Amino acid sequence: MQFTRTKIEDVIIIEPKVHGDHRGYFVETFRADKLEEFLGYKLNFGQDNESKSSKGVLRGLHYQLAPHAQTKLVRVISGRVLDVAVDIRRNSPTFGQHVAVELTADNKKQLLVPRGFAHGFVVLEDDTIFAYKVDNYYS
């Protein structure tokens, strides 16, 4: 897995290694040990969510405040989206700035969106399936 800090260093792009041949492919989509080693702290993802959307749908921007704040690890299972994270931490030097990343079923990129960020995406293909790991329960 490759981890890349974005212009907002707390937002991380994760690119898993894809092992493929004529039969298809295999990919580890999540490795807690590798992510925690990169971050320097432990995350406890306790819930997985999935949504299916049509082209043109805009989901977000959503955010949760304490005690319901969430770190999200998001990826596309089929289709593609333009995914956006906006820093809404008032005392942050990057307050109000955003990161936008195209996530697709083909590129397998994932985005780690920490607590204190608004998150959303616009769907770029019909029948896009989007998956979220979160470290706090939906409320």
PLM regions: where:
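Non-catalytic, conserved peripheral segments adjacent to functional cores
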Residues: 1-106, 125-127, 134-139
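Conserved metal-binding segment of the jelly-roll/cupin
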Residues: 103-125
